[in-house]
Amino acid sequence: PLAPASGDSPAPGTHPDPAAGSPATGPVPGPATTGDVASGTLFGALHTVCGEVEDLTDVTIRPVTVGTDRGLDGPLHALVLAAREAALNAATHSGCAEVHVFAEVTPSGVDVFVRDRGPGFSEADVPPDRHGVRHSIRDRMVRAGGDVRIDSGPRGTEVSLHMPS
């Protein structure tokens, strides 16, 4: 699997409390959600969290980044953490051997797409005690000024995250 850029592999089950953290960025970064704060770049952080998800799940995560890399500010850190949660959900629940993460920086902002080829799911059927989609993805992105679209069906799921410039 991809090794996190920081060289640290989180132990399974070491996720911080999702309810903790600032209203703008969500959880306080911990061993499993740091992104690549050492390099401080969007692309570095995305590659790091993809490696973390691989280490936690043994599912291959295939990140692709396009455009000019950017510094990792608060809203982009929230985007990276939402992408991590989307990739973790796909790796955990889709039944797929691999998940694709595509990130593109454009003049209008940053788009990240997390795709799997699993059986899909209905967001309405997610139990209220499950916080991944509702809080770790949707609420985190909205608090940081971005938006989320989830398209899911029998041929797979795509989580689209957008953070405007």
Question: Whereabouts are the PLM-identified features?
Answer:
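DHp/HisKA dimerization-phosphotransfer hairpin of two-component histidine kinases
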Residues: 1-62
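Conserved short strand/loop->alpha-helix "switch" segment adjacent to the catalytic nucleotide/phosphoryl-transfer site
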Residues: 40, 59-84, 124
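Conserved ATP-binding N-box helix of the HATPase_c
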Residues: 75-99
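Short beta-strand-loop-beta element adjacent to the nucleotide/active-site pocket used for signaling
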Residues: 105-112
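Glycine-rich nucleotide-binding loop
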Residues: 109, 120, 153-160
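Acidic ATP/Mg2+-coordinating residue in the GHKL
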Residues: 116
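ATP phosphate-binding glycine-rich loop and adjacent ATP-lid/helix-beta elements
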Residues: 125-154
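C-terminal beta-strand of the catalytic ATP-binding
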Residues: 161-165
